[in-house]
Amino acid sequence: MRLTRYFMPVLRENPAEAQIVSHRLMLRAGMIKQNAAGIYSWLPLGFKVLRKLENIVHEEQIRAGHVPMLMPTMQSADLWRESGRYDAYGPEMLRIRDRQDRDMLFGPTNEEMITDIFRSHVSSYKDLPLTLYHIQWKFRDEMRPRFGVMRGREFFMKDGYNFDLTKEDALHAYNRHLVSYLRTYERMGLQAIPMRADSGPIGGDDTHEFLVLADTGESEVFYDSAVTDLTFGDRDIDYDSVEQCQGVMEEFTNLYARTDETHDQALFAAIPAERQRQARGIEVGQIFYFGTKYSDAMGAKVQGPDGKPTAVHMGSHGIGVSRLVGAIIEASHDEKGIIWPEGVTPFHCGIVNLKQGDTEADAACDALYASLRALGLDPLYDDRKERAGGKFATMDLIGLPWRITVGPRGLKNGVVELTSRKTGESSELPPEEAIEKIAKIYAPHHVSGNL
């Protein structure tokens, strides 16, 4: 994309309403615009990141054997009355009445709707196990929306639901989701720690939240520092293997890690003092097992092997996709701006022309731009007639991992400058070598065209 043809309304000054780094940088980088309290338009740069995160979530869900679908944002209140949650959910639920005087709601979650879909179409244990998921906009009428997309009223979320014949099968689904989430977050350049948590209004006995450690996090957390040394890496997991998924589950949850709602001081005190940590974290996902809570209430049953009807065991699993954008920025920034991990960057690299209008510099930039695009990469070419300092400041603010700087002096020596946003280190090399290096860097990140 050429910057002269792109819509990226960057701000020079820090917005007064922004209280945390991610909110400030998303506004300054022209990623979002607030339309109402806790409700944002996603401008092109922010939308690209949001879509990249969504694609990663889809890829990892499908890898785990989960089936994508799409449910509506509007739901009938009757389903929620059936489960008993319509009155219990509280004022966070936006209740609406249509022209036929029917009670509706803007869905904050989808347990009731997915249970209704399941009971309408599945009647035999032979159709199990089954996990369905979708990625959709949700609405929760927060009393005090704040911190930009971190605590908004409208948010983009992946929620999945598993249906199993037995508790053992459902707990395997729970472990399978934990494994898929670990893969998902690592692909995004995040370390998200699974922590024992409270189930809240969704209910159930087993639940883990995935938290990214950050000073601006709303959750107080207590953990054994050894959990921060755990990485999933590139291990190949058979999601159908109970033993493999259980092994990963135990590896990542046996060490103490809990939110304040479930914190046990006695257990925490048993950790060696030098490994005890108390910090703050940003919740970016949660998994639940809630047994037959919804299937009992809503009659979601299948005919078992013995021919008798039996209520299915269920779980739900969520990832806050829009919140992840803010969480990544909170975890990866400096005083100049955002530092995007290579797996989620909106553009793979930036091209800065130091002398726009110079025939040789323009031609070299055009050639770089065309070559990168031919390899399936997505560069952002700053072709504005702007001073070099302004171009560098823009690139630093929006945080692209790599910048290729092209100027007449370097071209006389047959080189361009390649700079890492993360380290600030630069090297001079021929244009074709810069292209080759960028291509190698992004080879592991599933480059599949431009969004």
From Swiss-Prot:
It catalyses: tRNA(Pro) + L-proline + ATP = L-prolyl-tRNA(Pro) + AMP + diphosphate. The keyword Nucleotidyltransferase does not apply. GO terms for cellular component: cytosol. It is found in: Cytoplasm. The keyword Protein biosynthesis applies. Gene3D superfamilies: Anticodon-binding domain, Bira Bifunctional Protein, Domain 2. GO terms for molecular function: ATP binding; proline-tRNA ligase activity. GO terms for biological process: prolyl-tRNA aminoacylation. It comes from the Bacteria. Its EC number is 6.1.1.15. Keywords: Aminoacyl-tRNA synthetase, ATP-binding, Cytoplasm, Ligase, Nucleotide-binding, Protein biosynthesis. Its main location: cytoplasm. Catalyzes the attachment of proline to tRNA(Pro) in a two-step reaction: proline is first activated by ATP to form Pro-AMP and then transferred to the acceptor end of tRNA(Pro). Homodimer. Belongs to the class-II aminoacyl-tRNA synthetase family. ProS type 2 subfamily. This is Proline--tRNA ligase. It comes from Roseobacter denitrificans (strain ATCC 33942 / OCh 114) (Erythrobacter sp. (strain OCh 114)). The lineage of its organism: Bacteria, Pseudomonadati, Pseudomonadota, Alphaproteobacteria, Rhodobacterales.
